[in-house]
Amino acid sequence: MAKGKDAPRVRVILECTGCVRNAVSRGVSRYITQKNRHNTSKQLELRKFCPYCHKHMIHGEIKINK
């Protein structure tokens, strides 16, 4: 089956909510992953390790500008 425009799996970028909220000057932790739009229609939020905060934080999905 060909992957077209309506492919259920899309790439998403997860960004640390703690770094964004606290305006950390060192940087912002980002992860790239995939999600299935049919199973997860809402924005994705995962607990992942942030090297700038030095602990596990919630990383939320951000919008990709193309």
Swiss-Prot record:
Compartments in which it is found: Plastid, Chloroplast
Disulfide bonds: none
Family, similarity comment: Belongs to the bacterial ribosomal protein bL33 family.
Domain of life according to the entry: Eukaryota
GO molecular function terms attached to this record: structural constituent of ribosome
Matching SUPFAM superfamilies: Zn-binding ribosomal proteins
InterPro entries linked to this entry: Ribosomal_bL33, Ribosomal_bL33_CS, Ribosomal_bL33_sf, Ribosomal_zn-bd
Entry protein name: Large ribosomal subunit protein bL33c
Taxonomic source organism: Jasminum nudiflorum
GO-annotated cellular components: chloroplast; ribonucleoprotein complex; ribosome
